[in-house]
Amino acid sequence: MNIIQQLEKEQFDKLSATKTIPEFGPGDTVIVNVKVVEGERTRVQAYEGVCIGRSGGGLNESFTVRKISYGEGVERVFPVMSPMIDSIKVVRRGKVRRAKLYYLRNLRGKSARIVEKKTDRAAATS
C-alpha cells in the first residue's frame, strides 16, 4: 500500500466514523440534505430524486441523483464523503437490472417510473 492509499484510508476511516451513509444503489429514491451557504447563513436544502448511478470508491466515491423540476430534468452529482452533505435518506427501493440508469434521460411520464422492490414480509414485520 503506497502513501497516498494509506492517507486516503485514514481519512475515509475518520469520516465514516462521524457520518452514517445508508446502503443505496441505482433505482433507489433518495433525499439528500445539502448544506447551502447564502452569504453568512447556512441552511439545509432537501434534494429528492432517483439515484441513477454510483461511481468510484473510497473517498472518491460519488453518486448521481436525477429529479424532474418544473418539467425539466435536473441531475446532480454528489461526492459520498462531501462535508456539504448533511444526511442521506432512502425513501423507496427500486428494482432495476442496470448499474447506470442513463436511459431514464430519454423517458418521460409513466414510462420513467421504476418498479418498487418487494421486501420480505417476515423481515418487514420484525
Swiss-Prot record:
This is Large ribosomal subunit protein bL19. Belongs to the bacterial ribosomal protein bL19 family. One of its GO terms (biological process) is translation. Gene3D superfamilies: 2.30.30.790. GO terms for cellular component: cytosolic large ribosomal subunit. PANTHER family: LARGE RIBOSOMAL SUBUNIT PROTEIN BL19M (PTHR15680:SF9), RIBOSOMAL PROTEIN L19 (PTHR15680). NCBIfam families: rplS_bact. PROSITE patterns: RIBOSOMAL_L19. This protein is located at the 30S-50S ribosomal subunit interface and may play a role in the structure and function of the aminoacyl-tRNA binding site.
